[in-house]
Amino acid sequence: MVKSLIIVGIGSFFGGALRYFLSQQIKSITEGGFPWPTMVVNLLGCLMIGLAYGFFNRLGLGGSTWCLLLTTGFCGGFTTFSTFSNESLHLLQTGCYQAFIGYVAMSMVGGLALTLLGYAAMGSPSLTHP
């Protein structure tokens, strides 16, 4: 368990660092209020987690240390949206359509509502991204 936590932590560090770096680079070349950095990072994260799980599953290494490092660690540090996307796809592929709809709806609506609640709980005067 400790080894797994360290592996996830290492992957998360590099994923988070890359997220910050890419976000800054994208921010420097885009204008306006649209959150391009977040969208690009989230979409890249979805591609990365799909590639990683596809690769490791094809080789029968879905539970390997490398899989843990790159998926839960790196992709998790890069973006949790990639995990949400992968889990949603799993629900679709296994025919759990009601669970899929519920999961997506609750995640999106609940996420927005809880973000708003967080701003309100902190007494934030506006809903601005730092």
Residue ranges and their predicted role:
Residues 1-130:
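Membrane-interface helix-loop junctions in multi-pass transporters/channels
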